[in-house]
Amino acid sequence: MIFQQTLGNKATFSGIGLHTGKTITLTLRPAEAGTGIVFHRVDLSPAVSIEAHASNVVNTRLSTTIGRGDASVSTIEHLMAALYGCGIDNAHVDIDGPEVPIMDGSAAPFVAAIAKAGVKMSGKARKYLVVKKPVTVVDGDKKATIIPSRHYKISFDMQFAHPAVKSQFRSLEFSQESFIGDFAAARTFGFLAEVEMMKSHGLALGGSLENAVVIGDNGVINPEGLRFQDEFVRHKILDSVGDLSLAGHRLIGHVKATKSGHDLNHKLVTELLKRPDCYTLIEFTPQAFNAPFNIGIPELSWLEA
């Protein structure tokens, strides 16, 4: 799809904030082409608007938080992944609290509501951020790299010293179908001992077996088990889609991540954006673009030079 898209109608959600434990209502509204994704803290007077962009990220501990002045919105990554995965470029997000509702811990409820609201195409072309040179960020044994590619792809290597998780690897070659079918329903997860510790420090107050996969000493304690055998790494990729969408444009490049998380995802986007020699922004015309949603671009032969 080469044209910017927004929602056909409004979509409203109410749910618990994972970390605050508060009930929050969020409404997605259509927006004009060129708007981007803009959050509005409508519970404040006056309301505060915050663009969903890497330059507005103020915290990456446990989730991704954007802010402006004293106002902020946290845990935006699942909603951002759903918007990106459903092809939504422009939307207003009215929210009456400091955190996006966790829903069931995945992006699936957001995806379903966006599908019900419908998608409206504009007449304005999208701009794609095409990676020209590799960019890498490292933090100890954690690493994230984005390299030139004909498609948007994320390859994730996850490693935990726990028998229920161990090592998991998976790749997503991005398309709307693959994201919605294989990744959107993957839930956030945590270790029981860590959840108890966080709650004692005023965090994860809304966490439960209804909105997260919880791992005990002997494995997953959720009665229904896992939705996918490798649900953990699928969720890490879902998080990455949401975090990387804060680049502000559709990406064309291959992300290779090892033990990455919200902080390293943000550092990768920030490092990429501050190195204009490593990417180019391209606005495609219908005549120049004849690929499906996964944005393979046969015209860009220079990527293989």
From Swiss-Prot:
Binding site for Zn(2+): H78, H235, D239
Required co-factors: Zn(2+)
Gene Ontology cellular component terms for the protein in this record: membrane
Record field: catalytic activity: a UDP-3-O-[(3R)-3-hydroxyacyl]-N-acetyl-alpha-D-glucosamine + H2O = a UDP-3-O-[(3R)-3-hydroxyacyl]-alpha-D-glucosamine + acetate
Protein's GO biological process: lipid A biosynthetic process
HAMAP family: LpxC (MF_00388)
PANTHER family for the chain: UDP-3-O-ACYL-N-ACETYLGLUCOSAMINE DEACETYLASE 1, MITOCHONDRIAL-RELATED
Protein name: UDP-3-O-acyl-N-acetylglucosamine deacetylase
Organism: Geobacter sp. (strain M21)
